[in-house]
Amino acid sequence: MFIENFKVESPNVKYTESEIHSVYDYQTTELVHDEKNGTYQWTVKPKTVKYEFKTDVHVPKLGVMLVGWGGNNGSTLTGGVIANREGISWATKDKVQQANYFGSLTQASTIRVGSFNGEEIYAPFKSLLPMVNPDDVVFGGWDISDMNLADAMARAKVFDIDLQKQLRPYMESMVPLPGIYDPDFIAANQGSRANNVIKGTKKEQIDQIIKDIREFKEKNKVDKVVVLWTANTERYSNVVVGLNDTMENLFASVDRNEAEISPSTLYAIACILENVPFINGSPQNTFVPGLIDLAIKKNTLIGGDDFKSGQTKMKSVLVDFLVGAGIKPTSIVSYNHLGNNDGMNLSAPQTFRSKEISKSNVVDDMVSSNAILYEPGEHPDHVVVIKYVPYVGDSKRAMDEYTSEIFMGGKNTIVLHNTCEDSLLAAPIILDLVLLAELSTRIQLKAEGEGKFHSFHPVATILSYLTKAPLVPPGTPVVNALSKQRAMLENILRACVGLAPENNMILEYK
């Protein structure tokens, strides 16, 4: 059974006009390695920590500024939100299609809230806490190309022509602000697009981005802004002591106009200084140590890296299943080809290397979780290939071969073929990232013994379900298994309304 909304009635939760206040018993374990009777042994001690959560229920008017607004992802997301807001339908060769938010965790998935008369009851994910309605989001952003969003949508060739015709009047007046362009960080083949760039030193470029954010906020009368990088994948930045390893050194490097400070890092610096959440949707190492240091000191949300949309999402499910079933993946070979501008930019070796790293690390935590299957230091052979094939456009092909060892020396091979519209998978993920980032800024918590409420850690692990290479605070374990990531996100939001985590025990029927 499906219900549209619900309210929790419990002594552990209180609703007021301004906030939801909940008390939550967090049950976890503590491990002790000590000597008993002359030998060392592990002891696991269950423990309960009481937390309190406060969620501001005022839903702000949200502005979203995209770096790379005129790219396939930016034009697809903007057009998709307009189509939903205006209730647009269009003819395809199969049927009349209605606008929807399929592919969005927040808008098109559900959570289990209990059972009634022997039937499971589900509610929309977005009903857990007050969230921004995507139809109300105001879009803007930057691009190194001055092409308006209607022409960018036509160039992308993602939407059906009938839909493009209906969207054009809404989008042809949308023109990106000039963006930061540094040809050293992206493929040379992107130079022909770069007719809309911010001149000056790196310090002057940061100042211009700050000015753009302030003017966008004022012009559109939005309460909050979230900035997200959906521009070209950059090459990795060199992390060097004295250059970008601390906040102070990073600022000094900007003042010296050091060449190794990337455009994406400059955008992030501007956002952090303005206390505006910044999310990196590409695989490069935007968040150099000095930038993370700055975000922590300014307590500004940062999240990333790289949208987890197709092949990698499947991988984080399948490898988790295999290792969890006691099957040993020994070889993972992933091949991709695509023909959009992302594929064109990734045809350069230095930018491909960034993508290869983010795609390759996705199985690490699952492998390290099972020392029965893997010896220390042992890891599956893992190869990732991406090729640019212009003809296929945004219709990305992904082929994977998983070879595993099974019972008594046997071998098992699984082969997958996945064809998808790259931007139609990425756009709802971008939407989820900005909506959840905004929601995160309205949640405060404190553990038993802490004197006052505080926000989540600025490095937003809560967004990890949506990213290939989750950014985590120093010393925090990285979790890539998709089911664990979703459970973490859902259960934190459940805690904010005083609900227990979904453990699937269903003891009442046992």
Curated annotation (Swiss-Prot):
Top-level enzyme category: isomerase
Catalysed conversion reaction: D-glucose 6-phosphate = 1D-myo-inositol 3-phosphate
Gene3D superfamilies: NAD(P)-binding Rossmann-like Domain
Main location, first listed in the record: cytoplasm
GO molecular function: inositol-3-phosphate synthase activity
The EC number(s) this enzyme carries: 5.5.1.4
Compartment(s) of residence: Cytoplasm, Cytosol; Nucleus
Keyword tags: Cytoplasm, Inositol biosynthesis, Isomerase, Lipid biosynthesis, Lipid metabolism, NAD, Nucleus, Phospholipid biosynthesis, Phospholipid metabolism
Pathway of action: Polyol metabolism; myo-inositol biosynthesis; myo-inositol from D-glucose 6-phosphate: step 1/2
Domain of life: Eukaryota
Annotated binding of NAD(+), by residue: 70-73, 143, 180, 190, 193, 230-233, 281-282, 306, 309, 340-342, 355, 393-394, 422-423
InterPro entries linked to this entry: Myo-inos-1-P_Synthase (IPR002587), Myo-inos-1-P_Synthase_GAPDH (IPR013021), NAD(P)-bd_dom_sf (IPR036291)
Role: Key enzyme in myo-inositol biosynthesis pathway that catalyzes the conversion of glucose 6-phosphate to 1-myo-inositol 1-phosphate in a NAD-dependent manner.
Protein name as catalogued: Inositol-3-phosphate synthase
Highest classification ranks of the organism: Eukaryota, Viridiplantae, Streptophyta, Embryophyta, Tracheophyta
Gene field: INPS1
